[in-house]
């Protein structure tokens, strides 16, 4: 079996052969109070179930389809909210950036900085992120094959940063649809020499009404897609939840209802424990 790398986020070990880590929260910071409410719920549930947890939210959705769509509070206000979440709940934080200038200020506050899928080949941004020394989560672009992630890993490595997590978020299937190739998880592990792979279930459920200005979604299939991904033996899940998904300011149609978080995670933990309890069978 290929050796699996471990990336440390504080006291959390993220690896394909360790219990799964949950990277989860809300799509975009809508308000300070809502962020506190959602984070508190995640912390309560993950503590109760013994699941390692990192809170996720964006301070700026810079790639919204429509210029009229809500983007977020911006970096300055967003970082204040993240710091309060850390101080209040002792939680680790992951968020995405979109420009080189954001890299260091964001890395000074959060624990993981995320390279967006649409920007994953932007070398200047990769270099700026790498130089922070932070743990990096790389979203695999929808247009990129799983074996091409090795090139992104190489860019970060050349810049001196080996603390890389890779995130699957679906692949384009014709126009306005995404599919997840379950064989791709193993390909990504091999292409990255065993880097931790996490699965963005929420954004893999996106689809689009060609006449609309925002993404649709298929949240009713969250459970089956998450189970399929975990069954391949991966390092973590990436999900978004909201107390009222139909009122969410971004990607509500793909978001898990917050009141279903605990039963969802109970099933995910049971499945992950089962899969990782099996002896590895190496077929060549």
Swiss-Prot record:
Belongs to the KdsA family. NCBIfam families: KDO8P_synth (TIGR01362), PRK05198.1 (NF003543), PRK12457.1 (NF009109). The gene is kdsA. GO terms for cellular component: cytoplasm. Its EC number is 2.5.1.55. GO terms for molecular function: 3-deoxy-8-phosphooctulonate synthase activity. It catalyses: D-arabinose 5-phosphate + phosphoenolpyruvate + H2O = 3-deoxy-alpha-D-manno-2-octulosonate-8-phosphate + phosphate. Keywords: Cytoplasm, Lipopolysaccharide biosynthesis, Transferase. It is found in: Cytoplasm. It comes from Aliivibrio fischeri (strain ATCC 700601 / ES114) (Vibrio fischeri). Pathway: Carbohydrate biosynthesis; 3-deoxy-D-manno-octulosonate biosynthesis; 3-deoxy-D-manno-octulosonate from D-ribulose 5-phosphate: step 2/3; Bacterial outer membrane biogenesis; lipopolysaccharide biosynthesis. This is 2-dehydro-3-deoxyphosphooctonate aldolase. Gene3D superfamilies: Aldolase class I. One of its GO terms (biological process) is keto-3-deoxy-D-manno-octulosonic acid biosynthetic process.
């Amino acid at each position: 079996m290929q050796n699996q790398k471990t990336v440390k986020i504080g006291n959390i070990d993220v690896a394909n052969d360790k219990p799964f880590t949950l990277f989860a929260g809300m799509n975009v910071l809508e308000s300070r109070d809502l962020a506190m409410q959602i984070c508190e719920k995640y912390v309560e549930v993950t503590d109760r179930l013994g699941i390692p947890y990192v809170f996720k939210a964006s301070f700026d959705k810079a790639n919204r389809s429509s210029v009229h769509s809500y983007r977020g509070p911006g970096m300055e206000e967003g970082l204040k909210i993240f710091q309060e979440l850390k101080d209040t709940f002792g939680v680790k934080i992951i968020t995405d950036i979109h420009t080189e200038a954001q890299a260091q200020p964001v890395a000074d506050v959060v624990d993981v900085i995320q390279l967006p899928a649409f920007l994953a080949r932007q070398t200047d941004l990769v270099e700026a992120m790498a130089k922070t020394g932070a743990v990096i989560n790389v979203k695999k672009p929808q247009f990129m094959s799983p074996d091409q992630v090795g090139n992104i890993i190489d860019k970060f490595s050349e810049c001196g940063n080996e603390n890389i997590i890779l995130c699957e978020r679906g692949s384009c299937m014709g126009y306005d649809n995404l599919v997840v190739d379950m064989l791709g998880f193993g390909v990504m592990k091999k292409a990255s020499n065993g880097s931790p792979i996490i699965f963005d279930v929420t954004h893999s459920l996106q689809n689009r009404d060609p006449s609309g200005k925002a993404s649709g979604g298929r949240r009713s299939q969250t459970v089956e897609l998450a189970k399929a991904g975990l069954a391949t033996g991966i390092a973590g899940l990436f999900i978004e939840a909201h107390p009222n998904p139909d009122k969410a300011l971004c990607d509500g149609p793909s978001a898990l209802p917050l009141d279903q978080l605990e039963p969802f995670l109970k099933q995910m933990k049971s499945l992950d424990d089962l899969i990782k309890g099996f002896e590895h069978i190496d077929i060549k």
